[in-house]
Amino acid sequence: MSRKYFGTDGVRGKVGEFPITPDFAMKLGWAAGTVLASTGTKEVLIGKDTRSSGYMLESAMEAGFSAAGVNVALIGPMPTPAVAYLASTFRADAGVVISASHNPFYDNGIKFFSNSGTKLNDAQELEIEALLEKALNQNAMQCVASEKLGKVRRIDDAAGRYIEFCKGTFPNHLSLAGLKIVIDSAHGAAYHIAPNVYRELGAEVISINDKPNGVNINDHCGATHLDSLQTAVMVHEADLGIALDGDADRVMFVDHNGHVVDGDEILFILAQAAHSKGEMTGGVVGTLMSNLGLELALKQMDIPFVRAKVGDRYVVEQLKRTGWQLGGEGSGHILSLQHASTGDGIVASLQVLKAVLESQKSLSEIKAGMTKLPQVLINVRLATADADSILATTSVKQAVIKAEEFLGDQGRVLLRKSGTEPLIRVMVESTDNIMTQTQAEYIADAVRAA
């Protein structure tokens, strides 16, 4: 049975349009609260990013949870991985994040974490959806008795607790003293946290894009727009730059030359560091979108590599299936299960900094063992949300077949719909730049014409 509202990363959409409305948020809170209240402490944590719409959705969810008899603890603007960590620390039934991650301010979303700090599984989401459907269509939302209504409280020291958690994943014998780091918080949830983590570990920190106003989150900044970070690294002659996205669950780097170090290269750096110390347990989990260069570089070290479906939840599932510790995506979602239960941009960045310090080399030098193959990704925006019918058309299928025949064993093609936006992603990878670009545009044209 497929999920109706939960995409690859919870519920997401444009604010004010279904399902990102106060009514939906309230009924989702009630449905989730009813499911979660059947066992556990009957308390949930709610965190959010810096979008102005977060206040509206937070209040609506509070009402829904209270109606279901579930208490709510508010932790304010907080990175997504912080909510996962704190939900586990406070023994809550669940953590709720109100965020649309790297999307523009006019989008928002809602996702849940279990009390073990991992994302809800498909079965739990389906159970919540079944109740939600009744609340939406049959007016089946029922309030508990007045004396059983949930209460709301604030946790004032949440940021400090999470800062200490992040610092605790960095070895005590190492210090960032002597490193000049530029941190781009994307005007997002980590604006008051990330700079303090690096400063307290000894680094000289230049903080940019750290003044959220409710509408500037991810606006030409952060992990999806690295231009301002590249410029700042060069202007300040920094050792490196770190970019988080709006909810700080992904991270990208810029080396001292201003060159981008993406999620695939971060995975290589972490695997290489563990391998050099004889600490690599198992292999690495990437996704269907992971650059072939990562797979080849890991193969040189005899490190196994498998591809999961796109989405960090599927990377986590594959890691648990294999018993491995390290996985992630080129977009900067990095999973290091020995340190955190979900993708954590700050924690992942600290592991990279650890690798830099222990190698006594620059970031540019330690990534040099991996050569990325030319990869072109074209996002084709759809007029309608019916991506499945477009992918099923004969013309699109024929275009893919022809491209694969042309590339032969020198490349690969991947066509997939976005789980969060009305997009079809066309990815082509091969040993030749021109060939890669040409074939990607050929398939993208077929998608647009379908």
Curated annotation (Swiss-Prot):
Name recorded for this polypeptide: Phosphoglucosamine mutase 2
Q: What UniProt keywords apply to this chain's record, in alphabetical order?
A: Isomerase, Magnesium, Metal-binding, Phosphoprotein
Catalysis: reaction(s):
alpha-D-glucosamine 1-phosphate = D-glucosamine 6-phosphate
Q: What class of enzyme is it?
A: isomerase
Q: What is the lineage of its organism?
A: Bacteria, Pseudomonadati, Pseudomonadota, Gammaproteobacteria, Alteromonadales
Q: What does the PTM comment state?
A: Activated by phosphorylation.
Provide the cofactor list for this protein. Mg(2+)
**What is one Pfam family matched by this protein?**
PGM_PMM_I
Q: Name one GO biological process term.
A: UDP-N-acetylglucosamine biosynthetic process
Task: List the EC numbers from the record.
Answer: 5.4.2.10
